[in-house]
Amino acid sequence: MSGDPGKDQPNLFYTKVPQTVAHDTLLLQGKVKSVYSIANEPERVYVHFHDKVTAGNGRRIDFPEGKGKTCCLISALLFEHMEKRGIKTHYIDCPNLDTLLCKKLTIIPVEVIVRNIAAGSIVKTTTIIEGTNISPPIVEYFLKDDEKDDPLLTHDRVRLMGIDPTPMKEVALEVNTNLQMLFTLMGIDLVDFKLEFGYDSHGDLFLADELSPDNMRLWKKGTKERFDKDLFRKDEGDIVEAYKYILTQLRQFV
């Protein structure tokens, strides 16, 4: 596996010269990311990735060095990959190794999960065995609310909240198709992943948040070796080294 992105092998991971990003007002402090306004640019924000990992809705925390940069660079590559395929995202640029420049959105309080292989909560709450292929993939919705432990929502409940889930589902399945094709080239199974969406000031829907192993499950084909946050959840290995492996592979295929 490779070294720290942006240090010992900068050209392998990113081709741009890092810039100094001056943060303005903090708009939102998440578990592992911070969102900042930009002076004189009301339609744009900076999204800063921290060297931090959490599990259990923040009940378990660690601060692995290099994790923020790695997730940021993976997200930049995958957002660019989606944009090239006609999927609208909040991504604009990656001005620094740990910071994205993004469109300012009103985030929809619903997390969208796409499942291709059974793992995680679907195994814990049903009789489905881990590793079972799910074809066609299923799309689930969860309320974005840590205090309520992000409960599962039905399609109708999302509609009762005043949100039409259909456009999000359609985009999520498009993202799934494109990610599956990409990860298959890398010898990786895309088990499942979480997406967030938001509206811009014109009411247009955009893919938001991040695209990284922090919000995906990635297994090596044939062995089920993990390259995602389950390594931290299950205390099975070094997530930064696993994430760097994914970043190195992505650079060869996107």
Residue ranges, per PLM feature:
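A long amphipathic alpha-helix within ATP-dependent nucleotide-binding catalytic cores
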Residues: 161-191
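Short beta-strand elements
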Residues: 49-50, 116, 206-213
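Active-site loop/lid in soluble adenylation, ligation, and acyl-transfer enzymes
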Residues: 15, 19-143, 250, 254
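Conserved metal-phosphate-binding beta-hairpin within the catalytic cores
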Residues: 114, 190-209
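C-terminal helix-cap and adjacent tail motif
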Residues: 211-254
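Short histidine-centered catalytic/ligand-binding loop motif
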Residues: 59-69, 148-171
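A short glycine-rich, hydrophobically flanked beta-strand micro-motif that places a catalytic Asp/Glu
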Residues: 92-97, 185-199
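Juxta-kinase regulatory segment immediately upstream of eukaryotic protein kinase catalytic domains
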Residues: 5-15
